[in-house]
């Protein structure tokens, strides 16, 4: 299979890792030869008003164990995306389509692709279901 891009990049929290996370990583890898995943640090999540169930070092290890992922780095700020795209010579930035349009500012540095989310599953939904039990 001839892939369109050489280096892909995506970012996320990846708390309570589920099939939707796996699907987006698989589809992101299908676009390129090498996939870099930035996992949001606990400190960055607190800045965004999010509290994770799983600490960042564990979330990074989980993502690193996925066969579609070639490199895992911590994400510590919003500005890091531009820095990383330049630093790693990223050809394609990949996100779920729930973020559609939010990362178009990266188009001056690389292609930006929004992939459809896996329906019926999200970390927010899982947290709500667990809270109700």
Predicted regions and their residues:
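Nucleotidyltransferase catalytic core that binds NTPs
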Residues: 1-133
